[in-house]
């Protein structure tokens, strides 16, 4: 089951948010860059440009260019568009394992998930300590940038039915934009590992 090109999925999410906000595709011209640094360069050169960057690149770009500011949080926009009690979330990262590996190493997978959840809890409880580890691991060049970015990263851990509902809603949006982006249909229940 292919999930399509990662950059196309980002475009589908953006187009969904634009459309759901009442704008037509014709009202917005999208230009994609392959690196966050390219977007930051365009923003530095053109004061009328609008850029879309993920964290921590937003925080790093603002630190280098004080004329930049955050005007939209896509997670908040996504959440505001979810009606009828939908638990859909703007999912940007998941842990995936194939069924053979899961069957052979269920305890290992469960341990990984438990430690992953603990890591996220640690990051929320001690952003300064987490930022130092993030810098040490080379994920972000400076701990100060990581620490400033962490609250806006929306790092969460979901499992069980909450995870399934959040991801299924997200995949439904991708399906509506381009069915092939999710392999032609929504995944069956056995796609999800409900611990």
Model-derived segments and spans:
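Short, surface-exposed acidic
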Residues: 25-29, 138-149, 181-188
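Secondary-structure end/capping motifs
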Residues: 102-177
């Amino acid at each position: 089951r292919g999930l399509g090109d990662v950059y196309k999925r980002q475009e589908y999410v953006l187009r969904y948010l634009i459309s759901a906000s009442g704008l037509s595709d014709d009202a917005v011209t999208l230009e994609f860059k392959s690196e966050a640094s390219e977007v930051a360069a365009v923003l530095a050169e053109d004061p009328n440009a609008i850029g879309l960057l993920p964290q921590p690149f937003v925080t790093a770009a603002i630190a280098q260019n004080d004329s930049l500011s955050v005007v939209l949080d896509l997670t908040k926009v996504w959440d505001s568009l979810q009606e009828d009690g939908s638990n859909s979330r703007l999912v940007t990262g998941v842990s995936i394992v194939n069924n053979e590996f899961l069957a052979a190493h269920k305890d290992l997978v469960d341990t990984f998930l438990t430690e992953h959840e603990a890591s996220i809890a640690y990051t929320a409880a001690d952003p300064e300590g987490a930022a130092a580890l993030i810098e040490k691991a080379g994920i972000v060049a400076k701990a100060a940038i990581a620490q400033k970015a962490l609250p806006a990263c929306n790092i969460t851990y979901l499992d069980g039915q909450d995870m399934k509902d959040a991801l299924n809603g997200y995949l439904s949006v991708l399906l509506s934009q381009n069915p092939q982006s999710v392999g032609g249909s929504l995944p069956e229940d056995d796609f999800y590992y409900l611990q």
